[in-house]
Design a protein with these regions (language model features):
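SAM-dependent transferase fold signal centered on methyltransferase-like domains
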Residues: 1-204
Length: 204
């Protein structure tokens, strides 16, 4: 940044599933200038503003036990602009009460209640309705592969890539089901791996 300049706003712009631009609004500043700024997320023309302390001051919720995970009905995957902005904790407080973060290093979010049609979630990421949740092991991989022969597959914070998980499931790409292999934190316990089958909700 230029000497003597202070950041007043950061614009993170995403379109068509890609982060296109990162724009800084700079103004002249003295040595004692306040460093607070506004973080503006633009996802396909939908705009949401955060202050510079939003992420630091947000405390995400995590699951206490497996029963809590199994009670979830919705999964949210942040869009490219939110991810580029690094707003991984602020998601829980800004996009819907009751959102639970999968794990400290897994940026997927769950809710027991699916959002209404005008929810910000649908504009700032992908919303999925959960149809199946099981612990990830050899038996569940085989069962999921047989149950959902056509599905998109994503691995998040587990010991295999998306392609490796797809090969183990033996599924073909396509259909309306998305299978996530997810590392999930449960309180103070060690993270464990789960399979979640979900169907994406269409944007209104």
């Amino acid at each position: 940044l230029s000497a003597g300049a202070a950041t007043r706003a950061v614009h993170v712009v995403s379109a068509a599933g890609e982060c296109k631009e990162l724009l800084l609004h700079l103004v002249p500043a003295g040595p004692s200038e306040d460093v607070a700024y506004t973080l503006i997320v633009n996802e396909n023309g939908h705009i949401k503003e955060f202050d510079s302390s939003s992420e630091e001051n947000s405390v995400p919720q995590f699951f206490n036990d497996e029963e809590g995970l199994r009670s979830m009905s919705m999964l949210f995957e942040p869009g490219k602009a939110l991810a580029k902005a690094g707003l991984f904790n602020a998601v829980c407080s800004s996009l819907g009460a009751g959102l639970v973060k999968a794990a400290r290093s897994t940026h997927l979010y769950f809710s027991p209640d699916a959002p209404e049609g005008d929810s910000d979630m649908q504009f700032f990421g992908k919303v999925f309705d959960i149809v199946d949740v099981v612990s990830l092991n050899k038996q569940s991989i085989k069962a999921f592969g047989a149950k959902y022969p056509k599905a998109e597959v994503s691995a998040r914070n587990i010991s295999m890539t998306s392609d490796e998980l797809r090969k183990k499931l033996k599924v073909q790409s396509g259909g309306n089901v998305h299978i996530f292999g997810i590392g999930i934190d449960f309180g103070d316990r060690k993270s464990s791996n789960w399979l979640v089958a979900a169907v994406r909700r269409q944007t209104v």
